[in-house]
């Protein structure tokens, strides 16, 4: 099943995760702002990308979020 890697702003912190259903996952998080999403990709790719992004500092994550076109939101 295809996965999405996403970043949300949850209580002032950038949360990075993986999901197959972004709408449901956002509801589970309490509907925080979706800042970035990538995919679809296979599970291995998504896990690797999530791990990569989680290793970044906040500034680099924010820079990635700023590059996402509005139409993808």
Tell where the protein language model's regions lie, with residue ranges.
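GIY-YIG nuclease catalytic motif and its immediate N-terminal context
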Residues: 1-51, 58-73
């Amino acid at each position: 099943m295809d996965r999405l890697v996403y970043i949300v702003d949850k209580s002032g912190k950038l949360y990075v995760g993986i999901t197959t259903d972004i709408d449901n996952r956002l509801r589970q998080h309490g509907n925080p702002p979706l800042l970035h999403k990538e995919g679809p990709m296979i599970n291995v790719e998504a896990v690797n990308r999530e791990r990569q992004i989680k290793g970044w500092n906040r500034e680099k994550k924010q820079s990635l979020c700023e590059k996402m076109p509005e139409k993808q939101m």
